[in-house]
Amino acid sequence: MDDDRKKALGAALGQIEKQFGKGAVMRMGDARAVRGDVKSISTGSLALDVALGIGGLPRGRVVEIYGPESSGKTTLTLHIIAEAQKAGGAAAFVDAEHALDPDYAEAVGVDINDLLVSQPDTGEQALEIADMLVRSGGLDVVVVDSVAALTPKAEIEGEMGDSHVGLQARLMSQALRKLTGSIQRSNTLVVFINQIRMKIGVMFGSPETTTGGNALKFYSSVRMDIRRLGAIKKGDEVLGNETRVKVVKNKMAPPFKQAEFEILYGEGISREGEIIDMGVAQGFVDKSGAWYSYNGDRIGQGKDNARQFLRNNPQIAADIEARIREKVLGTALPEAEPTEDAASDTEQKSGKGS
């Protein structure tokens, strides 16, 4: 580029910076240096973290989780919240369905005393609350459950049989246009849970679609389709569900990968079961007949006994998981970045100690 053009560009950049602030325009290499690598928050499922390619869900992005009823959508989001809290982060749950069970959330591992919960009356109120929470910059995860329950105010105030074509789609489109910038700036992971509906008269292809129009499909960096495969039984007693998640869209890594795991009633995702399955697949756990062994020591006969052994010995479970992550992802367990409040607390403590 010649000197005159460089001067003209420099003057334009200076004017933009003066009017819109520092960092309004920057060279892509500088932007990458400022933002660094995309941080992730674990999903609570080792297999799903691997399928996502970056060890979890990306911070500063929109994620959609959809599937049929009782497929494990809310359970998965509660695990995401629990993982963020374990790493010192904070989370909020916008419960538009008014169906969140605090006892189950606690059983899954969520610190309910540290979880912000909102049960809004209208879709506009729900999305406005989500926007304000994201803009605060103090949260790591915001979950909206669910898009289908975000009822526009006009529909709530109208008569039961009134037609309100496209209201919800317009609401979602407007909200996502407003939210996207603040989500990226605050580095908050925003998860939308969605339901499935059937399109009428579809001859070819899948008749399934998600609610709320197409905006969420476009704005989401990751979309996950979660399905119940079958029941986990011990004799006649049903203990939980076998679940499959397909990553149908992924802007962070190659898409269309799948993960299978067990969701146990009253407990959530069976992490020990995943560690055993993936440990065997990666060669860290030996399986001979019904016996499972690790480092030459037998850890149980049958998967249930091996799972119980890992529950009783969390350090061994953590060691196997760390080795699996190191081999498959080349990383350790992902951590959520501390919030601004947590960072200031740490600085104050270090100041007192010095």
Curated annotation (Swiss-Prot):
Region (Disordered): 329-354
Residues that coordinate or bind ATP: G67, P68, E69, S70, S71, G72, K73, T74
Keyword Coiled coil: no
GO biological process: DNA recombination; DNA repair; SOS response
Record-linked InterPro entries: AAA+_ATPase (IPR003593), DNA_recomb/repair_RecA (IPR013765), DNA_recomb/repair_RecA_CS (IPR020584), P-loop_NTPase (IPR027417), RecA-like_C (IPR049261), RecA-like_N (IPR049428), RecA_ATP-bd (IPR020588), RecA_C_sf (IPR023400)
Subcellular location field: Cytoplasm
Keywords: ATP-binding, Cytoplasm, DNA damage, DNA recombination, DNA repair, DNA-binding, Nucleotide-binding, SOS response
Pfam family, one: RecA
GO molecular function list: ATP binding; ATP hydrolysis activity; ATP-dependent DNA damage sensor activity; damaged DNA binding; single-stranded DNA binding
Gene Ontology CC terms, in alphabetical order: cytosol
Function field: Can catalyze the hydrolysis of ATP in the presence of single-stranded DNA, the ATP-dependent uptake of single-stranded DNA by duplex DNA, and the ATP-dependent hybridization of homologous single-stranded DNAs. It interacts with LexA causing its activation and leading to its autocatalytic cleavage.
Family as reported in the entry's similarity comment: Belongs to the RecA family.
Cited NCBIfam families: tigrfam_recA (TIGR02012)
Name listed for the protein in its UniProt record: Protein RecA
Source organism of the structure: Halorhodospira halophila (strain DSM 244 / SL1)
